[in-house]
Amino acid sequence: MQFPVFFFRCFSYGISSMPLKNKVVFNENMERKDTFYQLILKVLSALLLLSVRNSSGHTRHFVQSSEKIYRRSLFKQ
């Protein structure tokens, strides 16, 4: 496992296990509404994940291999 991926997993696990004072806030329609703090954390973690994925290039390889499998299944039919 590469170092940035390992660091990100530890970071996201630490965020998810942190006790937040107001975990879930409901608005009038009883829909779940994230607090501003949780929203910032979600955006930051998504950006981190994207940068890690772009630097390692694993997702590009995964997409290419899934396309190959899909084309093979079309060809067999």
From Swiss-Prot:
It is a single-pass membrane protein. The keyword Membrane applies. The chain crosses the membrane at residues 36-52. Keywords: Membrane, Transmembrane, Transmembrane helix. It is found in: Membrane. GO terms for cellular component: membrane. It comes from the Eukaryota. This is Putative uncharacterized YKL165C-A.
